[in-house]
Structures are given as structure tokens and as C-alpha cells.
Amino acid sequence: QSHNNTIRNSYFYHIDWSASDTPGLMVTIMENGKDANFSNNIIHLTGASATISIGDAPTVMYNEIWNTGLLQSDGAVVQMMMAEQKGANIAYNWIHDTKKYGIRMDGPAGGTNEGRNATVHHNVLWNVSAGLMVKGDYHTTHNNTVFGEDYDKNNIIVLYENGFGNENSITEFNAADRIAAHRTGSFEDYPVQGGYNESNNYNGYVDSNGSVESQLIDPYNYDFRPKNGSAIYNRSVGAYGPSDNWIAGITWYFMGSELPFEGCMDTDATNYNE
């Protein structure tokens, strides 16, 4: 347990083969201190339930993460428990193709949720089982883009249940097909609490200008800018503006190791290369 640690520009893959002996909530990369910085990394093909849980007030920026939590149920890619949320800054990440939550401000099932003051912005999430799970209160969730397969959950969940949750949170300038205050229920039945204005978000539950994916230039080739004249463009919502060009992940080219040579290694042998 220590403070102000930095993990940057690193590539993690094919890890947690058994997901045994992992600490806490079953986490791939875990830190129990505070003010850790995890940025410009790539993670994929992991086994543990949660991928990143790096202590109080984490900064998680410019990472690309996919194909996670393959050996355990539940879980999230970026996981924050209640005490960890204050001062958290989760931004400019690409999170995709996983059946886990993308970014989760977590808390107890029922009872009092004391999670407060996390900021989640300018993230792109696609083909994720619920892109954002916002539990607690006084959070700011803005300029995120969520689209694609949702595994029967809402894309952005600003949770309000049992009469409590997010009454003072701000949710604005997001683009998603399904935004609500419930895991699966509609916006009509479960409207978002706190600072939420329909005209300052694109929510497929109430907007009828096509899916978020259809309004992006070329999302599966990582061009998440809005098409000119689309509703997302006209409202200036989502993670990218027309001229934005930020990229998540490492700043160097990763080339995987070559497979070992099969067969005889002696070039003078009669059976060489057979």
C-alpha cells in the first residue's frame, strides 16, 4: 500500500489464467493506496472478475481495454468502491467487447451508499454489459459515448433505487442508446435524478434520430467523431467533437512473440524442417 504510483504505457495480456489467489474483489491490477495514475495502457484477455481497482482517488486515462473477466462472474473493467470514488478521474478510455460493466462506481446492494464525487468523462464504450454504472451521489458523468451490444442492460445507469441515489449528481453531454436510473428499466419509468437535461444528452429512450453507432463516422475503425448534421453533432454530445483526434492505448507498437520452430533444429540433418 503506497501513494502516487504510476503505471503508464504498458501492455498486459493473456493473464489471470486461473483467477485464483487474486485479492479483494478478484482484480487483475490492484492498488490499495491513493492517487495512483494508470494511463496509456492496453489490457486484454484476462480472467479475473474486475480489471482495474487502484485505490482512492484514482486517475485512469487513455487506456484501451477489452475481452476481460473471462473466468468469473459479475465484475467491471474500472472498479471503484465507495471510499475510492472521491476525487477519481476516469477519462479518455476505450473499453469494449466485454460482458462486464465498463466503469462502475460501486456500493452495497441496498443500504446506504456513501460513494461521492467521482468524475467520468470522454470515454468510449462499445459492446459492453452496461457502459457506466453510477451509484452514490454528487458524481459528474459527462461527454461519454456508449453504443453496440448491451447484454440487456442500460448503457448508462445513474442508479436511483429505494428512494435514494444521485439526487445531486450531474449527467450531461453523453450519447447512448439507453440512459436511465435503473439497470434495465426505461427512462420513462426510471428518469435520471439530479442535474440531467434531455436536451443536453442523446438518449435513445427519448430521442428518435437513430442509434448512436449510426451517427458516428466509422466507429469500428476507431473514428468516433459524429457525422456532420447528426443529432449528436448538433447537440455537441459524446466523447468526440468533429475535430477531436485523441487515441487511447500505448504509444508504441506491440508485436507478439513468434511461435517456436517446430521440428528438427539442425540445418545439416536430413530431416531438417520436416
Locate each region found by the language model.
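Primarily marks secretory-pathway-exposed extracellular/lumenal segments that are disulfide-
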Residues: 254-274
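Short "repeat-start/strand-capping" segments in structured domains, especially the N-termini
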Residues: 3, 34-35, 56-59, 86, ...
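Predominantly extracellular beta-rich ligand-binding scaffolds that present long acidic/polar faces
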Residues: 95, 105-107, 111-223
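Extracellular beta-strand/beta-solenoid scaffold signature
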Residues: 1, 20-31, 45-51, 72-82, ...
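Right-handed parallel beta-helix
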Residues: 1-51, 55-65
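C-terminal accessory segments
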Residues: 204-260
